[in-house]
Amino acid sequence: MMIPPEGYRAKGYKVWTVGDDIAWMRKGPDGRLYAINPENGFFGVAPGTNMKSNPNALISTQKGAIFTNVARNLDDNTVWWESLDKNPPVNAEEWKGAKVNGPEYIAAGNKLAHPNSRFTAPTANCPCLSSEFENPQGVPVSAIVFGGRRPDTVPLVYQSRSWNNGVFIGSITGSETTAAAAGAVGVVRRDPMAMLPFCGYNMGDYFKHWIEMGEMLGDKAPKIFNVNWFRVDEDGHFIWPGFGDNLRVLEWILK
């Protein structure tokens, strides 16, 4: 759902969305790796989503969407969450169901929406949906990008030396925990390929499957990279601007 920076848009760059979460990948007739999106919607964290950070995601929620654990404006029956805008509803129902004065509630150190509140929106709502979304053959995969949330140590982007080295890089992924994970927030947790909560079998067997994929694809295997958008400076501010500017890194990866 990325929107290219202004300079890229002036050059004619466009970004089309096939999926934002799950990719099912298989070898195509030409020997390359292809991927489809098995889902028919988008599932995202609400807090922090706004018209500046992810306008296409927000536009996708305008109809037929499901919101969980967000706040509700009781005056007009609309939803609200932190960073949606700077105008929390005065007559609000916070995520646990209590009726509160939104600005006063926030000023007291509370959250109107749960930090891990979510939205689920139909794929058809996406203004940048790729024309290849319904293609049963999928789309060719040019690169595989792993990444974790690390405030230090890990650079913005680097490339693996080989497919197997890329599998190793994915296997040692670590990420600082957020409200989406159980337990303490802000602790670096080992999360191989960001799949720890989702892999239903032994991780060693999972890595073996990846290595076998590389053997099957041979010299047509996509290159593997690792990114870290979340490095911070000594004052705790993000060094990289993120969002649409991530296209600068993706351009380097693809070229």
Where are the regions that the model predicts?
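Conserved NTP phosphate-binding and transfer environment spanning the P-loop NTPase/kinase superfamily
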Residues: 47-50, 55-255
